[in-house]
C-alpha cells in the first residue's frame, strides 16, 4: 500500500484523479492525498473496496465490465444501508457505463453498480453474485447477457426489470 504525497503523484503512479480516494493497480493499492482527511469508517470502506480489487485481480479480465467489478467491490466494502428515496428513479437509467463511472455523476453510477450487486445477492444469494462475477468478469468471459443467463437462470431483460422492481421496495 502506498499513500501518494500529491495529486500529481497519485495520477502518475496510481492512475487516479482528484475525485478518487484510492486505486488498485497491479501489485499496489494507492491512496490519494485526500484520503488522509477521511473519517475512519469511510477509510475502512475504501480499503475493503480496494482489497477486493487486489484479491480478485488475478481472476479478473482486463476487459471485464467495469461497473460489475466496482459494484461487487462496493458490495463487499460497504455496510448494508436502506436505499435512498431516489434509488428507484436512478435505477431507471439502467446499468452504468464506463463513461458514467468516470463522469460528473460518478457517485450515482457507483451506487447503481452497488445496488445491482445488492439486488443479485438479496434475490439470488451471495453465491450467485460470486458466480456472476466469475463468469462475467473472468478471463474469456462471455457477454453479460450470457453470463446473467448462466449464473441467474434468467435473461438480462428479466433481471433488469426485477432490479427496478426491487428498488421500489
Question: Model-derived features: where do they sit?
Answer:
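Surface-exposed, flexible loop/turn segments at secondary-structure boundaries
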Residues: 9, 37, 81
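Auxiliary, metal-adjacent structural segments of Zn-dependent hydrolase domains
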Residues: 1-27
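Walker B catalytic acidic pair
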Residues: 50
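Acidic/histidine-rich, surface-exposed loop or edge segments in extracytoplasmic proteins
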Residues: 31-33
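Acidic/His/Gly-enriched intrinsically disordered linker/tail segments
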Residues: 20-28, 41-46, 54, 58-169
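A mature extracytoplasmic/lumenal domain signature
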Residues: 3-5, 35, 136
Amino acid at each position: 500500500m502506498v499513500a501518494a504525497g500529491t495529486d500529481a503523484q497519485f495520477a502518475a503512479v496510481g492512475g487516479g484523479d482528484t475525485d478518487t480516494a484510492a486505486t488498485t493497480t497491479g501489485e499496489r493499492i494507492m491512496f490519494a492525498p485526500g484520503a488522509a482527511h477521511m473519517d475512519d469508517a469511510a477509510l475502512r470502506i475504501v480499503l475493503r473496496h480496494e482489497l477486493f480489487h487486489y484479491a480478485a485481480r488475478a481472476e479478473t479480465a482486463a476487459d471485464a465490465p467495469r461497473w460489475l467489478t466496482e459494484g461487487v467491490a462496493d458490495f463487499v466494502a460497504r455496510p448494508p444501508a436502506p436505499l435512498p428515496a431516489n434509488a428507484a428513479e436512478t435505477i431507471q437509467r439502467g446499468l452504468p457505463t464506463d463513461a458514467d463511472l468516470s463522469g460528473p455523476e460518478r457517485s450515482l453510477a457507483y451506487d447503481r453498480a452497488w445496488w445491482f450487486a445488492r439486488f443479485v445477492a438479496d434475490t439470488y444469494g451471495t453465491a450467485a453474485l460470486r458466480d456472476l462475477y466469475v463468469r462475467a468478469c473472468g478471463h474469456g468471459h462471455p457477454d453479460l447477457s450470457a453470463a446473467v443467463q448462466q449464473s441467474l437462470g434468467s435473461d438480462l431483460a428479466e433481471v433488469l426489470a426485477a432490479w427496478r422492481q426491487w428498488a421500489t421496495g
